[in-house]
């Protein structure tokens, strides 16, 4: 019994060595991030992407984290998205890119897995692959992604339902701060919003990325929008 405190301390130390927490945003400026300067800034202690009807992006562009690629990880952050009127009634779409690659560096365009969110009632929480295979899991679905003859059109096997889409939507606060969590371990991907699991995916395809960059999306749209991010915490295995 006398050895138990030592064993417990050893286990705690081992766990600490295995996992590393890293704050990705200092709350003050864009240090560690790069994007099209005219669209990104820090406002009210948050990374802020903004377009207006008179000043739009020509295609989806991203604020890209500059400290290398990430493989297995847990990422949590808070986000807020509003339409051109500062509400959540018209257009507003964004997402968190992970295990992605830069495909157009001059305009900070990436492709890859995306944890989607929006002002609307449908897409927040889904798994989307930007400039790739499109929607891989709708909100509330457990999915296994299988190979097919066309790598861009994989076979999506829905193996279960986590929750109804409308019940997940009811937990999202419009035009306010929400918490997003992404867990990626091997080919197993999970998204959470405000503690609610929204998708659970196993990607068994060869093209499923195992590592890549992190980035935040500013979406092209018919009208302006503002998206903000803060409290960005990355946990990885050392």
Q: PLM features: residue spans?
A:
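Bacterial N-terminal signal peptides
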Residues: 5-14
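Carbohydrate-interacting regions of secretory-pathway proteins
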Residues: 19-238
């Amino acid at each position: 019994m006398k050895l138990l405190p030592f064993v417990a301390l050893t286990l705690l130390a081992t766990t600490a060595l295995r996992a590393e927490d890293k704050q990705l945003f200092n709350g003050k400026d864009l240090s560690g991030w790069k994007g099209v300067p005219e669209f990104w800034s820090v406002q009210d202690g948050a990374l802020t992407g903004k377009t207006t009807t008179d000043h739009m992006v020509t295609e989806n562009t991203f604020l890209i984290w500059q400290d290398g690629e990430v493989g297995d990880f847990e990422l949590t952050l808070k986000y807020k998205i509003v339409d051109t009127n500062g509400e959540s009634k018209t257009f507003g779409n964004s997402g968190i890119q992970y295990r992605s690659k830069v495909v157009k560096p001059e305009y900070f365009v990436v492709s890859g897995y995306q944890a989607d969110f929006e002002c609307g009632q449908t897409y927040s929480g889904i798994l989307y692959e930007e400039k790739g295979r499109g929607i891989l899991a709708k909100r509330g679905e457990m999915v296994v992604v299988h190979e097919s003859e066309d790598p861009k059109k994989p076979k999506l096997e829905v193996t279960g339902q986590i929750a109804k889409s409308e019940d997940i939507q009811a937990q999202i606060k419009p035009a306010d701060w929400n918490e997003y969590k992404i867990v990626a371990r091997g080919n197993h991907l999970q998204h959470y919003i405000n503690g609610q699991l929204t998708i659970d995916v196993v990607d068994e395809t060869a093209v499923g990325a195992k590592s890549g960059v992190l980035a935040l999306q500013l979406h092209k749209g018919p009208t302006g929008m503002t998206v903000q991010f803060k409290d960005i915490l990355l946990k990885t295995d050392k």
